[in-house]
Amino acid sequence: MSMANLLLLIVPILIAMAFLMLTERKILGYMQLRKGPNVVGPYGLLQPFADAMKLFTKEPLKPSTSTITLYITAPTLALTIALLLWTPLPMPNPLVNLNLGLLFILATSSLAVYSILWSGWASNSNYALIGALRAVAQTISYEVTLAIILLSTLLMNGSFNLSTLIMTQEHLWLLLPTWPLAMMWFISTLAETNRTPFDLAEGESELVSGFNIEYAAGPLALFFMAEYMNIIMMNTLTTMIFLGTTYNAHSPELYTVCFITKTLLLTSLFLWIRTAYPRFRYDQLMHLLWKNFLPLTLALLMWYISMPTTISSIPPQT
């Protein structure tokens, strides 16, 4: 793995993340009958870079009562994990070809909980701590359904390797035979990334800004960068699992174009949901998971396990 390969992966992700922030502000603006950012550069296209310059040149203030080490480590860890999640994704070739790529993504995304918990605790603020506890409970809860849904799709894929998902979906998207799982997966990714209508961790009316309330300047920017990278990564993963694109060695650029288009459409749906839906109550959020999603996903998992046995066949051993 050369440095050039690493840069060719990281730089486009950072650019995509910057323009996702701008796109969200534009969509929010137009949905509220206003223009959104339109001053810096043509049509406001340079706004993300202006924001980055402003945030990274400001003085990073630290509360005098905070635990400095964890306070600084938390945003850095959040961004590192957000970037690390991209390494096994085949687009069409992965940076690191892991046999257990899906397991790596699931395990690494669980580590993001620590950055949220540390930031809430180290800030020494009640608002930040309550926001962090909410975010951690929500993230851990929804990872249960994400893991079960992944296991169900892996039974049809026959491997933990993400590259084999491309071969599995050559003739049929997994979205069609597993559409209930796909719907629950998409809603769970909204909760996993703390997006509306599941953004209880940063409820402005009761918690001001949630776990990052005491952060300013560069560290705050790192949290936002990690959040938007996770959104793109989750939609990329959704595209791979349920909307697989057939790879043709003679025209690899066609795979990339189709892949990016599907990911962009799913990301736009994330933003559209933010503009259209109000926030859930916290008890409704937890009931949706433990009383609805968990029994449903377990029942469907049993169905996908028993079905090959019933029809006397086995999943493809790729």
Curated annotation (Swiss-Prot):
Catalytic activity: a ubiquinone + NADH + 5 H(+)(in) = a ubiquinol + NAD(+) + 4 H(+)(out)
Chief location category: mitochondrion
Biological process, per Gene Ontology: aerobic respiration; mitochondrial electron transport, NADH to ubiquinone; mitochondrial respiratory chain complex I assembly
Range of residues in the leader sequence: none
UniProt keyword terms in alphabetical order: Electron transport, Membrane, Mitochondrion, Mitochondrion inner membrane, NAD, Respiratory chain, Translocase, Transmembrane, Transmembrane helix, Transport, Ubiquinone
Cellular localization per UniProt: Mitochondrion inner membrane
EC number from the UniProt entry: 7.1.1.2
Membrane topology: Multi-pass membrane protein
Broad enzyme group: translocase
Recorded superkingdom: Eukaryota
GO molecular function, one term: NADH dehydrogenase (ubiquinone) activity
GO-annotated cellular components: mitochondrial inner membrane; respiratory chain complex I
Residue ranges crossing the lipid bilayer per the database entry: 3-23, 68-88, 100-120, 146-166, 171-191, 213-233, 253-273, 285-305
Pfam families documented for this protein: NADHdh
InterPro entries, sorted: NADH_UbQ_OxRdtase_su1/FPO, NADH_UbQ_OxRdtase_su1_CS
Function field: Core subunit of the mitochondrial membrane respiratory chain NADH dehydrogenase (Complex I) which catalyzes electron transfer from NADH through the respiratory chain, using ubiquinone as an electron acceptor. Essential for the catalytic activity and assembly of complex I.
Quaternary structure, from the entry: Core subunit of respiratory chain NADH dehydrogenase (Complex I) which is composed of 45 different subunits.
Family: Belongs to the complex I subunit 1 family.
The protein, known as: NADH-ubiquinone oxidoreductase chain 1
Species annotation: Gorilla gorilla gorilla
